[in-house]
Every structure is written in C-alpha cells, then in structure tokens.
Amino acid sequence: MYRILLTKRAVKDLGKLSEDVKLRIKEKFNLLLNDPTGIGKKLSSPLIGTYRLRVGDYRVIFDIDDDKVIILRIGHRKDIYK
C-alpha cells in the first residue's frame, strides 16, 4: 500500500478548487493508495511529473517514489501543463 504526500504547491492548488471538485479528487486519491500506475497515465513528456490522474476536467500530476505517491500539481486541464 502506498502513502500519499502533497507538495506545498499541490496543497495550494487544491485550496483554490470548489468543494465538489476537491471531494472528487480526494476520492480518486483512495484509488491511488493501492495501484497508482494502474489508474494513472504515464506522461509522454514528464516536465512536471511522471504520471497524471484524470478527474473530469482536472488533472492531478504525481510521481511515485518507493511506497509514496507524491502529488505535485492539481489543476484544470487547460492550465496544468503550462
């Protein structure tokens, strides 16, 4: 089982979102605990992270380090890759 850690930037990103989007993202975090590579998609050009998780129009960018899933960024799909 993996542990989820959020960077300061990810906490800030999450704080800017509406409550319903936060809830949907937190529900997806539970899926990351068991198999982050199974639910996440590997990025072809990992500039800001190695994997992404799709939550509607929002994306969660993360890396995996041993037993940790490190959430790097959270944002709308039109802005997250800039």
List where the protein language model places each region.
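Enriched for short, Lys/Arg-rich terminal
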Residues: 1-12, 16-23, 55-58, 63-82
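A short, surface-exposed loop/turn module that caps and links secondary-structure elements
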Residues: 30-53
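Generic detection of well-ordered alpha-helical segments
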Residues: 19, 23, 27-30, 34
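Charged, low-complexity, helix/coiled-coil-prone segments
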Residues: 1-5, 27-31, 43
